[in-house]
Swiss-Prot record:
It comes from Caenorhabditis elegans. This is COA8 family protein Y39B6A.34, mitochondrial. PANTHER family: APOPTOGENIC PROTEIN 1, MITOCHONDRIAL, CYTOCHROME C OXIDASE ASSEMBLY FACTOR 8. GO terms for biological process: intrinsic apoptotic signaling pathway. Pfam families: COA8. It is found in: Mitochondrion inner membrane. Keywords: Apoptosis, Membrane, Mitochondrion, Mitochondrion inner membrane, Transit peptide.
Length: 142
């Protein structure tokens, strides 16, 4: 069993499997540490790197989105508390208006994200098929 060192701790990891970590504090996306086999071909390496890039792009998008959400929600709550008086809490109905407005404002960005997410994932289908054929023949030779 080989091991790779995790940046967050010195845990020995079985390199035969992908590992899923805890959710990121900002993006809320779980980091995936993709396995790196010892005899990784160039095709496998390119596919792994493309998947890692996709995962990072996805995490970056959601980190930015969530930071914007938190900042705007905080501003909204602060404004509402000034209107209502410091001791009053913002109601669920008022927050639902904020959520609706936030999502409406982000509609174009979310649609662009969805389109790009599908495009990037669809582009990985052919490389994934080729990698699985390589792995199948590698296992068949054993």
């Amino acid at each position: 069993m080989s091991s790779i060192s995790s940046s967050s701790s010195n845990v020995r990891m079985d390199r035969r499997f992908d590992w899923v970590g805890p959710p990121d504090n900002l993006s809320k996306i779980r980091k995936i540490m993709l396995r790196r086999v010892d005899n990784e071909s160039e095709l496998e390496r390119q596919y792994r790197l493309a998947r890692e890039e996709l995962n990072q792009w996805n995490s970056d998008f959601w980190a930015e989105h969530n930071q914007l959400f938190d900042r705007q929600k905080s501003d909204f709550v602060e404004r509402k508390q000034q209107e209502l008086g410091r001791l009053e809490h913002v109601s669920a109905n008022e927050l639902s208006e904020f959520y609706r407005d936030f999502l409406n404002d982000r509609h174009v960005a979310m649609m662009a994200y969805n389109k790009e997410w599908y495009r990037r994932n669809l582009q990985l289908i052919w490389p994934a098929l080729k990698v699985n054929v390589v792995r199948f023949f590698r296992m068949a030779r054993r």
